[in-house]
Structures are given as C-alpha cells and as structure tokens.
Design a protein with these regions (language model features):
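Transmembrane helical segments that form the transport core of multi-pass membrane transport proteins
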Residues: 290-420
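Interfacial loop-to-helix junctions that mark the boundaries of transmembrane helices
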Residues: 55-66, 87-94, 117-129, 232-241, ...
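Transmembrane alpha-helix boundary signature
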Residues: 50-54, 85-86, 105-124, 128, ...
Length: 506
C-alpha cells in the first residue's frame, strides 16, 4: 500500500529495515505521521530516552477491533470525496486526525503512554520524516521541469509516454518517473473529452509495475537490498515477469485509448498546441537534480557510518540524517535556480503534496496496531492466514505468497509487507536468492505489482490522483479506481501467476 517509505527508492515510504523485527513486536510499519509529529516532539522534550516501562507493542495481545480505525480511515477516503466532496475537501485533515486519535488514545490508555510515545516517535522520526522529505523533494524538482511543444494526446504518444515512464521507473524510482511525466501527460490530453483512463493506466505502469527491476524502483525492493538481496538480483529474476505484465497492461491501454480517441474525434477539439511547435524541455537543471537525488539515496544505503542518535528509543543513523539534509538542500536549490514561469507553466501548487502528507500520516498512524498484529506471526490474530503459505510438506506456495503479499500491499504499506513475508519465508537473503528464489520473486512481484490495485497501494498513486484532480481530471473514486484496477490488473496477474508460479517457464 501506500506508502510508505522504507528508505525509499523514490517511490514510497521508509520502513524500519536496519534491524530484524522480533516476532510479536511492531517496528512501526510505515511512514506516516504528520499527526504523530507533535506527539513525537513531545516525547523528545519529555526525556529523549525510552523509560524502562516502554515495551514494544505486542501484536499477539491485540484483538481484532484494533483494525477498526484503519478500516474507518480507508472507508472515509473511499466514500468521503464521493458522497460529500465539498465537506471532505474542507475537513479531510480533521477526519484524518479523528481516526488517528482513535488509534493513539486507546494505545496510550491500554498499553501505557511511554509505549505509545515510543511507537509514535519511531513512526515520526524513523519513518515519516524521511518519507515526506523524499516525496516533497521529488515533487518540487519534477515540478520545475516544463515540457513544451506539440505533445498531443494521441494513442501513439500516450503509449510512448507510458512505455518510457515504465522503462525509467526502475532507474529514477516510481515516484521520480511519475512526477517527471504526469504533467506533460496531462497537458497532452487536456483537450480530450476522455482522459481519465490515461491517468489510471499511468498509475498502473509508471507508478508501480515499472519499479520492479531495481532497489531504486520501489521501496519494498530497497528493503530487500538492505537485508542482503544483491542490487541486480531483481533485474535478473523479475525481468520476464515485469516485461509480460507491462506488455499486457500497455496493450490493454492502447486498445482502450484507441476506442476513446475515436469517440473524442467526433467532437471538435479546442485548445490544441499547434502541430509544428517543437518539443522543448525547460528547467534542465532539475534533471541533474533528479540524478543527484538517486545518488544521495543510494549512497545513504551503502554508507555505514556506525554513528547514531537515540531519540526516545528511535535511532537516527548519521547517513540517514545526512541524506535527509541533502534532499532538503536539493529541493531548495530547485526552488532557487528554476525560473518561476516553469512551475507556473506546470500549474504547480503545494496542495497535492499537502494532501498526500496528511492522508499518509493518518494511514500509517492507524496502521500501527495492524502491522504489529501481522508481525506477531503464528501467535497473532492473523495466524489463520499462515497455513495458506505452505503445502502439506512444508514447501512454500509461491502463488499464495504472491497474492497475499500483493493483497496486503494494496491496502497497507507495501514495504513493511515485503519485510513481513521476507521474514516469513525465512529471512535469510542467501537462501532466498538461491533455492527459494521463486518465493522471493513472488513476494517482490506481489509487493510491487499489486500496489497498483488501490490509490493507497503506493505513495505516488495518490500524488498522481491529487495532481490530476487539481488539473481538472475527473478521477474515479476510491472504489471506482478499484473497478478499473480489478478489471485490468486482476486478469493480468492471473496470467502471470499461471505462467510463472503455477507452470513456471524454464
């Protein structure tokens, strides 16, 4: 799911990946926490070190009602804009705060203030801070790249943009690729009557599927990289699955876009850019800054400083602090050195990133007990799921790993989910890259591919939604999007399951 950052491959959230998670404890799954920032700050002022009674949140003692605030928030996101759009857009921050409070208050009352503050400090300082810094930096830098010229939203042009974005997503990350290309794509299709499907397929391909080939592509794979999976392992083991998935989805897009394009041509189109206008890219310095962002994130993972700062039980490692400072500096540099007219030409505003920040904060506050319950494994409330993962001989069912990892990644943060199933499969990188390579492949596919099933499955999904909505595209509701994703992606995933997991090719 959404998001989420786990150290982040330019696409999502940052999850605790530098230490193994003991069964029954919660490292605080995901990146999110705007609302928890204040509590975390209070925790820092309160002492800076964790008191003896601040035990880790034990998922095995949490009953199922702890899931309700998370489900309530998801339902609010799903139906709020649909049933009461004006009220939702005016008060969604308050609604997010309400559900977050319904998670945090019982947590403090039943498990102790110290435990709650330690958990929130970890979430805010160890997860959300890096998450929002990376997303904001990419949003700012990509917003300074202005593509001008006769870029018309024909099926050929649209397919080319989607294919290009899919190809570069594993290099600059799904968030990076999405933020670079979404505005030119919207501008190219602004005169078309039917353009919603273009954005929906853009989310499928560029914001998710394209990131499956490197740790820089999507947060779950970066988590695997930090746990010992070699940098090029995903490229060598997932290229066929990614190629087939992307090809099938792109073929579906071309068919749909041709059909809608023919409908649009029956109506006079106004406001098109003249065909003889050359394509010009302005703000080229921001392309260099994108490369610099990738380098900073990669180097932060490779550099082991051995220096850390303990803040109320959350260790901030020096390389992570340096990375975040460098990313903020890059964002500032983009704002300073990019002419204002470039962002004005892109229709750049701060509202989309603010909306993402608030919603993701609430999601990951509410997800705290859910993730703890998942980490409890066989002793936890979700123990009934685990027998589905192995056959009668104890061998892993790769198809089950794919679908369960993917289903949870569609509604939870995909990076923590990757880590949960990574540990469930043994947690040993050498074994998973060797004899259990098909299982690791299934986990990676599920975490990356199925993040496209919902708006909250991966961080860039909702950013794209927010940008498109602000630009006047009538994006489908939460459930409306799931109808699109279910109709297009589920059959594709079924084919991929049969070809690679049930009847694997040699």
């Amino acid at each position: 799911m959404i998001s989420r950052l786990d150290v982040l491959p330019l696409s999502g959230a940052r999850t605790e990946v530098r230490q193994k998670v003991p069964a029954g404890s919660c490292p605080m799954s995901a990146p999110s926490k705007i609302g928890c920032g204040a509590l975390a700050a209070g925790a820092v002022l309160a002492g800076g070190t964790v008191p003896a009674n601040a035990a880790a949140l034990q998922g095995l003692v949490l009953p199922w009602p702890w899931v309700l605030p998370f489900l309530g928030l998801l339902l609010s996101i799903a139906v709020g804009p649909l049933l009461a759009p004006k009220f939702w857009h005016a008060h969604y921050g308050k609604i997010v705060f309400m559900w977050s409070a319904l998670t945090v208050t019982p947590l403090a009352a039943l498990h102790g203030i110290a435990t709650a503050l330690a958990a929130l400090a970890h979430a805010a300082l160890g997860e959300y801070l890096s998450f929002i810094i990376v997303l904001t930096t990419l949003y700012v830098v990509a917003g300074g790249i202005l593509v001008m010229g006769s870029l018309r939203g024909t099926p050929l042009v649209n397919a080319a943009i989607l294919a290009f974005g899919t190809a570069i997503a594993s290099i600059v990350g799904t968030t990076g690729a999405a933020m670079i290309l979404i505005r030119p794509l919207l501008r190219a299709n602004s005169a078309r009557l039917h353009n919603v499907h273009v954005v929906v397929f853009f989310i499928f391909l560029v914001a998710n599927i394209g990131g499956a080939l490197s740790p820089l592509g999507d947060p779950p794979l970066f988590v695997g990289f930090l746990h010992g999976i070699s940098f090029f392992w995903n490229a060598t083991h997932l290229w066929r699955q990614t190629a087939l998935t992307a090809a099938l989805v792109l073929a579906a897009f071309i068919a749909v876009d041709i059909w809608y394009y023919r409908q649009d041509r029956r109506v006079a189109v106004v406001g098109e850019t003249p065909r003889n206008e050359p394509i010009v890219v302005r703000g080229m310095i921001n392309l260099l800054l994108i490369v610099l962002i990738v380098g900073v994130i990669l180097l932060s993972a490779l550099w082991k400083s051995g220096v850390g700062f303990d803040i109320y039980g959350t260790t901030l490692e020096l390389q992570d602090v340096v990375r975040d400072i460098a990313l903020v500096a890059i964002a500032v540099a983009s704002l300073v050195f990019t002419p204002d007219e470039h962002r004005e030409g892109n229709g750049f505003t701060w509202e989309p990133i603010l909306e993402v920040a608030k919603l993701f904060a609430g999601i990951f506050i509410c997800i705290i007990p859910v993730t703890a319950m998942l980490h409890a494994g066989h002793a936890g409330p979700f123990s009934w799921v685990l027998p589905l993962m192995t056959d009668e001989t104890g061998a892993p069912r790769d198809a089950a790993y794919f679908w369960l990892t993917g289903t949870l990644s569609a509604v939870l943060d995909n990076a923590p989910n990757y880590l949960v199933f990574f540990e469930l499969a043994g947690g040993d990188a050498a074994t998973l890259m060797g004899e259990l390579a098909p299982t690791l492949t299934a986990i990676a596919m599920g975490a990356v591919f199925m993040g496209a099933l919902t708006y909250i499955g991966n961080a860039p999904n909702f950013m794209i939604y927010a940008i498109a909505t602000e630009r006047g595209v009538k994006m489908p509701s939460f459930f409306g999007y799931m109808i699109w994703s279910g109709a297009v992606l589920l059959p594709v995933f079924a084919i991929v399951t049969y070809v690679f997991l049930i009847r694997p090719l040699p």
